[in-house]
């Protein structure tokens, strides 16, 4: 089970976008994440009429390493560490370390 999953709200804790919040759009292999509105780069795109792509300069979210983000805990309005716990029914769930609140209830 991963500490950060697709759809989680995260906050960037290191790098040029430190302090920005966003949703995880995808989790890539090698501990990389694509986060909405974070690590944006400008790419020059060639027009391709066969695919219906117009040319120009587009902004694209590039991957960021998972060690540079923390799961955002709305209860304390900060990034928080994630722990794992086994429930009585045998399910493995994530929880916030500071508040002991379950994430995957």
Curated annotation (Swiss-Prot):
InterPro entries membership: KOW, Rib_uL2_dom2, Ribosomal_uL24, Ribosomal_uL24_CS, Ribosomal_uL24_KOW, Translation_prot_SH3-like_sf
Any one GO biological process: translation
Gene3D superfamilies in the cross-refs: 2.30.30.30
Example GO molecular function: rRNA binding
Keywords for this protein: Ribonucleoprotein, Ribosomal protein, RNA-binding, rRNA-binding
The keyword Ribosomal protein is assigned to this record: yes
UniProt entry tagged with the keyword rRNA-binding: yes
GO cellular component: ribonucleoprotein complex; ribosome
A Pfam family it matches: KOW
Superkingdom to which the source organism belongs: Bacteria
PROSITE patterns linked: RIBOSOMAL_L24 (PS01108)
Subunit annotation: Part of the 50S ribosomal subunit.
Similarity-based family: Belongs to the universal ribosomal protein uL24 family.
The protein's role, per its UniProt record: One of two assembly initiator proteins, it binds directly to the 5'-end of the 23S rRNA, where it nucleates assembly of the 50S subunit.
Protein name, entry field: Large ribosomal subunit protein uL24
Organism this protein belongs to: Methylococcus capsulatus (strain ATCC 33009 / NCIMB 11132 / Bath)
Taxonomic placement: Bacteria, Pseudomonadati, Pseudomonadota, Gammaproteobacteria, Methylococcales
This protein's encoding gene: rplX
